[in-house]
Amino acid sequence: MSKKLFSIIFYSCVILVCILFLPSLIMPKNITIFGGKLLGHWSRFCLKFFLSTDIIVKGKENILNNENFFIACTHQSAFETFYLQTIFNSPVFILKKELLQIPIFGWYLKKIGSISINRNKVSKDNLGFFEDIFKTINSNNSPLIIFPQGTRVLPDERPSFKKGAARIYQELNIACQPVAIDSGYVWPKNCLLYTSPSPRDRTRSRMPSSA
């Protein structure tokens, strides 16, 4: 019952926030960003209240400050797309182009400056990708979040990493902040929730820029 309540109440609130924040699409971006942070804190509250699940964050002292960097994060559930917005300051997501085409949800992703890449096209068709990243980093002073696995995976899956994160690291010469998350044990992809140990967000020491 608690799992069903979680799903019903959490996603009902997500829909409500998306509707209430529609005016933010024509307002300053900070308003939309606040809505994302609100859902991040809401996800933590719901996990604790309905599933007695704590979020344990280790390594916050390793978070980079006062320099350009991007975040390479493992991807197991929808949880990290909400909660990482409460840890990092106004992050910008690098994501597959299809997500921007989702009504309402895609509008918000565009508003916060998300950068899309068409994974179905060869590299030469994505030449503007690194230019967009470079402009975003220099104009917004916001960290970028990329999921190198390319999609959500189960905790025991070990898919090969995509080349995007490595190319950003090499081409733009900026530091990388690795983040490991095990949220899939509690909030797995394409499944109903089930009770399990607390999700742990491990923020690891950075990889220095390649300079």
Could you tell me what each predicted segment is?
Residues 114-136:
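A membrane-cytosol interface segment of integral membrane proteins
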